[in-house]
Amino acid sequence: MRRLVVAMMVAGAVQAARAADMPDYYALRGPVGYSSGVVNWQGFYVGGQAGYGSADMNFSGSNNALIASALGPNNILIDVVQSVSGAHGKVGVHQTTYGGFAGYNSQWDDVVVGIEANYMHGKFNGTSIVAPVPLTYVTPFSDGLYHTIGLISGRSVSISDMGTIRARAGYAVGSFLPYVFGGLALGRADITSSVLIMDKSGNSISASQAASPQYYPASDSIGGKMLYGYTAGIGTEAMLFGNVFARAEWEYVRFVNAGADVNINTVRGGLGYKF
C-alpha cells in the first residue's frame, strides 16, 4: 500500500512539471478582461470620413445691432425698424462634407469610453434679404411727425470648417460598437451684413410720403470668425478585418455666435484604423 501511494505522488509531480513547461497559447486563452467574441477596441485610432449635411440658419433679428448703429443711440425709429428686420427668416442649406478623425478608447469588458477630435469641411452658405415696400405710419411718432420708413437689410453667413472635441461611450457587441457622444463644437465663418434705412417725415401722412428721404446706411464684414457651440450624436462602428473598421454616424451641431441661429445636422460614413 505504501508503495502504491508513493507511486501516485511521483506520477502527480511529474504531470505537474510537464504542465508547467507547456507554452501559454494566448490566442486560445483569449485576452483577459474582455468577453468571449468581443473585439478589443482599446487604443489610439485615426480615420477619414465623408457625408452629407443640412444647415438651418435663422436670421430673424440678426441685423438689430447694425440697425441701432446706423440710426444712432436713442433714435425714435430704432424699435420700428428692428421690428421690420424681424422678417428675416430661416434659410436651409445642403452640402456634402469630408474630413477626418482621431481618438483614443479605453475598454472595460464590453464598455468602451473615449475622447475624439473630429474635423469636417463643407461650404454652408446662407443669405437672407429683407426689402419690404416702404411703410407709412398713420399715427405720429414721439416727435409729433408722421413717418414713411423703408428698409433694405441683408445678412450672409458662410461656414466652411467645423471641428468637434467629444467624449463618447459605447457598448461592444461582437464586432460592433454602437455609441453616443457629446462635446464642444468649433467652426470658422465669414459674416457680412448691411442695412439701408430710409426715413421721410412730415406734419401729415401725405406730407411724409412726399418729403425728401433721409438715408441711414451701415455695413459690417467679419472674415474667419471663430465659432463655438456644442455637439451631440450617435453612431456605430464595425471591425472589418485586422484593425480596420467602418463607421456610420449622425451628428448635430449648434453654433451660438454665428450671426444667426445655426443648426447643422450631418450623416456620414468613414473608415478607420486602430493601432
Predicted ranges, named:
Residues 2-275:
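Gram-negative outer-membrane beta-barrel domains
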